[in-house]
């Protein structure tokens, strides 16, 4: 006796099955008794498949636009290349506190008028005066690399 399988469209990401909006084949009992009642999937009818294609085209266009914008921002940030911040220093080259992602985000906003989320900024521990490499993840595949120069604050 063979299993009956049906095509369903996933409404959310399900581990080991697929991502949201994927069309997959599952056992009809699994679909009827679990996926569909829990609103995790819908039966893949012709209307739903057309709707999927339409929304996929819209998502693709939005992604393309976002990627172009991210590349423009990357080019702008890498043209500037170095951002500076002044911090109070103690003995030697040690600074009081450290430089945070929020501060870098604010410096970039003040300089270029571009909002960068602090979660997308990756930097090493900044505890001394010097130049540091900072990586900014603008999009899944687009990252900008800038230099952060930490200077002693003049009294």
Swiss-Prot record:
Keyword RNA-binding: yes
Cellular localisation: Plastid, Chloroplast
Highest taxon listed in the record's lineage: Eukaryota
First and last residue of the signal peptide: none
Keywords: Chloroplast, Plastid, Ribonucleoprotein, Ribosomal protein, RNA-binding, rRNA-binding
Record bears the keyword Transmembrane helix: no
Short name of any one Pfam family annotated for the protein: Ribosomal_L9_N
One GO term of the biological process aspect: translation
Gene Ontology MF, one: rRNA binding
Any one cellular-component term (Gene Ontology): chloroplast
Database matches in InterPro entries: Ribosomal_bL9, Ribosomal_bL9/RNase_H1_N, Ribosomal_bL9_bac/chp, Ribosomal_bL9_C, Ribosomal_bL9_C_sf, Ribosomal_bL9_N, Ribosomal_bL9_N_sf
Family indicated by similarity: Belongs to the bacterial ribosomal protein bL9 family.
Function: Binds to the 23S rRNA.
Family matches, as NCBIfam families: L9
Protein name as annotated: Large ribosomal subunit protein bL9c
Gene designation per UniProt: rpl9
């Amino acid at each position: 006796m063979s299993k009956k399988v049906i095509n369903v469209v996933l409404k959310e990401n399900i581990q080991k099955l697929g991502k949201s909006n994927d069309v997959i084949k599952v056992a009809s009992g699994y679909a009827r008794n679990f996926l569909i009642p829990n609103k995790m999937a819908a039966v893949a009818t012709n209307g739903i498949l057309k709707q999927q294609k339409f929304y996929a085209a819209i998502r693709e266009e939005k992604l393309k636009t976002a990627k172009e914008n991210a590349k423009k921002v990357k080019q702008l940030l890498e043209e500037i290349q170095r951002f500076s911040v002044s911090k109070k220093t103690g003995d030697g080259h040690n600074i009081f506190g450290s430089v945070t992602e929020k501060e870098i985000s604010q410096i970039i906003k003040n300089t270029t008028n571009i909002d960068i989320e602090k979660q997308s900024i990756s930097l090493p521990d900044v505890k001394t005066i010097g130049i540091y490499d900072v990586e900014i993840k603008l999009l899944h595949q687009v990252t900008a690399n800038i230099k952060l120069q930490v200077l002693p604050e003049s009294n």
